[in-house]
UniProtKB/Swiss-Prot annotation:
It comes from the Bacteria. Pfam families: DUF494. Belongs to the Smg family. HAMAP family: Smg. This is Protein Smg.
Amino acid sequence: MFDILIYLFENYIHNESRISIDYDSLTNDLSDIGFQRRDIYNALSWLKNLSCYKKNIIPSINPLSNKITIRIYTQEESLKLNVDCRGFILFLEQLEILTLDTREVIIERIMELDINELNLEDLKWIVLIVLFNIPGCESAYHKLENLLFNFKEDIIH
């Protein structure tokens, strides 16, 4: 399922043009590429559930969103998000890329993935996908994109 999310993000979602996508033909295309139908449906369902936040996240952002808080992770969350992942989420909060609300959306979407443990690289993709899909998070998305993809270039110069 995770590979499908990355594939969709790189080939469909991140595309600036807003084309209407026929889910049946998309499912067939993904199946033809070699993805399993069950994983395709799970990935599309994951994205559909993410779209539920599009309407609710912006009004719910409160004045405390920019304050750094300590998130206590449940045992299940700690198993799926290792120390590096939890540290990276805190790092993004400190950079004000994530708010309390977007952090919670990201954690909730991660918990819905059908994987046992997320690695740091996969977490970065999930954060990009979530921020890209929530209206009002464009600035945070671009900050993260610059941080992730321009970091090596900045070191060289």
